[in-house]
C-alpha cells in the first residue's frame, strides 16, 4: 500500500559525489600510537604518571 499525501512533496535524491572527488582538503593519514609505545613515552616524561595510567587502564 503506497500512501500519497498531496501536502507532502517528494524529495529528489541526487547521486552522492564520489568521495575521492571532494573539493575540500583530504584528511591526513595519522595512525594512533599503540598503548605500549604510549607507555614508553610516558615513562620518559614522568615515570609515576605512567604507573598511574597503567593502574587506570588495567595494564
UniProtKB/Swiss-Prot annotation:
Modification type Deamidated glutamine: residues: 59
Region spans: Disordered: 1-59
Post-translational modifications: May be modified by deamidation of its C-terminal glutamine to glutamate by the adjacently encoded deamidase. This could be a prerequisite to the subsequent conjugation, as shown in the other prokaryotic ubiquitin-like protein Pup.
Keywords assigned: Isopeptide bond, Ubl conjugation pathway
Known function: May function as a protein modifier covalently attached to lysine residues of substrate proteins. This may serve to target the modified proteins for degradation by proteasomes.
Covalent cross-link Isoglutamyl lysine isopeptide (Gln-Lys) (interchain with K-? in acceptor proteins), where: 59
Record carries keyword tRNA processing: no
Protein family according to the UniProt entry: Belongs to the ubiquitin-like protein UBact family.
GO molecular function list: protein tag activity
NCBIfam families documented for this protein: ubiq_like_UBact
Protein name per Swiss-Prot or TrEMBL: Prokaryotic ubiquitin-like protein UBact
Pfam families: UBact
Superkingdom of this protein's organism: Bacteria
InterPro entries: UBact
